[in-house]
Amino acid sequence: MSQPPWRCFSLLIFVLTIFSTKPSSASTSCSSSFHCPPFNSSPPYPFSASPGCGHPNFQIQCSSSRATITIKNLTFSILHYSSISSSLTLSPITNTNRNTNNCSSLRFSSSPNRFIDLTGSPFRVSDSSCSRLSLLRPCSPFTLPNCSRCPWDCKLLKNPGRILHGCESTHGSLSEQGCQGDLLGFLQDFFTRFGFEVEWDESQDPYFIKCRDCQIKNGVCGFNSTHPNQDFICFHKSRSELVTQRDNNKRVNHIAVLSLIFALTCLLLVFSVAVAIFRSRRASFLSSINEEDPAALFLRHHRSAALLPPVFTFEELESATNKFDPKRKIGDGGFGSVYLGQLSDGQLLAVKFLHHHHGATAAATEHCKAFSMKSFCNEILILSSINHPNLVKLHGYCSDPRGLLLVHDYVTNGTLADHLHGRGPKMTWRVRLDIALQTALAMEYLHFDIVPPVVHRDITSSNIFVEKDMKIKVGDFGLSRLLVFSETTVNSATSSDYVCTGPQGTPGYLDPDYHRSFRLTEKSDVYSYGVVLMELITGMKAVDQRREKRDMALADLVVSKIQMGLLDQVIDPLLALDGDDVAAVSDGFGVAAVAELAFRCVATDKDDRPDAKEIVQELRRIRSHTRVADDDVAKN
């Protein structure tokens, strides 16, 4: 009779345990393995449950269910850890014994009894968590029972975003009724079930910098837990330990051979059981591929399913684009190709297929996949929460192992770049001025009407889509970023409000100050918009290698001509050939006024640049004077 499989594996573990040695030094103590959910194995650096190990601000306590971490005297349960994005999903552990008799009607006992402020710690609340809170509809406290006895709960009901320091609600008005149950239920789920995401920046923390050097030297990272400064310590193994380790490695090799023989014997005895387990696991894996899709899990974690756009299957979009027929390709960029798709109901839509990055190394491929996934999810989260006539609308998405796809409005008349630099018909000055104003209105909406504000980061003539009636829509939000500031600066509109992030964008449009300082603000979009204005004036490309080196960037060329009083040398000659545009070219409120505005937009010091509201006001003033001038020319 064969031995039960559990006895074979128990005996194997017993043999390995006999020959194993117990580490005794501080370094081996810090590197010892132990189980600590939700980490798949031992918590990696910077986390540690041992005093003096890891990072002093990332000390955790392990339990059988979930690890906990204390940040600024608040204890949180760790629901999820992502090594790719350096983020944690936390749920606050509240005092279940606190007195809630006076607030029983509010049913708010499982939420924090004060706002969560991470200022002064390495952590910051992620953009996506702030975005989820900002969509909540506030309640009026005057319609709630016991509001005078529960001032904190009432403050939250007036502004739910207050519970996370730095997040605010996008809804300014208070609802008189019908919101309490929805709001409290959402907050209960937000903290107890889903949690909120926090991030940290390893590049700015000296502990991480020193730890990388320590690990290169085969050291173990820790700190002096007995000193107030908690100085970094790199634990190095002594010579005797290294010799012992080499001996142990030899012994482990022998043990491995014996163990392998023993394990094979057990596997032969329980072969039928192993086959059954394999078939069961394979069937379970195949049935759960779609359920475990990382993009779908990420989106459901950061946004309610009711707020997300519809989901298409890969087969639906493959059929709509005739298997991604090259003849249906209507655009191609750095992040993906765009195809014309026709759904079963006859609706025409644009299907954006993100690139696969074939032919790259394994490491580069994984990096590109992570970046594409982040860009994909980022565009879905932002576009699903905005609504403006001059911004493209997201109709749905598809996350499939075969590809990531986004379904947008199909704009039939190409891009602004097509009209200015190639395939499109000639554009009059009045049309160009209207396009400039519509683009500015879209930028104003992103910067001032959304909380937290959105920086597009890629406003270019290729991302401005033109409809048949010459109305425009700004698209491609893959690089967009939410600006989440602290409570002291959230109501400010100065350029000192910024987030630190790696420069991304299109050459020729990228803000040089952002490129140098890594500080992203709304004024970075203003710079890109200024380059688009220069394209409208000159008809030239933002970057043209056929021009002289000093004039290769359009911004440099136009700025130098304006400073020398030679603007007329770079004005699009097609404007001067059109009789209707003569007044605009010669009048001070026409092309010259827009050129002056573009000059201000690309100012070296971002404090000298106008904001989106100022740009809209100035363009409206210019347009009104231009129309008066056109009418005078028509009368004569």
From Swiss-Prot:
Active site: D458 (proton acceptor)
Extracellular side: 27-257
Domain Protein kinase: 324-628
EC identifiers of the protein: 2.7.11.1
Enzyme class name: transferase
Membrane topology label: Single-pass type I membrane protein
Localization: Cell membrane
Keywords: ATP-binding, Cell membrane, Glycoprotein, Kinase, Membrane, Nucleotide-binding, Receptor, Serine/threonine-protein kinase, Signal, Transferase, Transmembrane, Transmembrane helix
Reactions performed catalytically: L-seryl-[protein] + ATP = O-phospho-L-seryl-[protein] + ADP + H(+); L-threonyl-[protein] + ATP = O-phospho-L-threonyl-[protein] + ADP + H(+)
Signal peptide: 1-26
Transmembrane annotation, as ranges: 258-278
Family annotation (Pfam families): GUB_WAK_bind, Pkinase
Entry protein name: LEAF RUST 10 DISEASE-RESISTANCE LOCUS RECEPTOR-LIKE PROTEIN KINASE-like 1.5
Phylogenetic classification of the source organism: Eukaryota, Viridiplantae, Streptophyta, Embryophyta, Tracheophyta
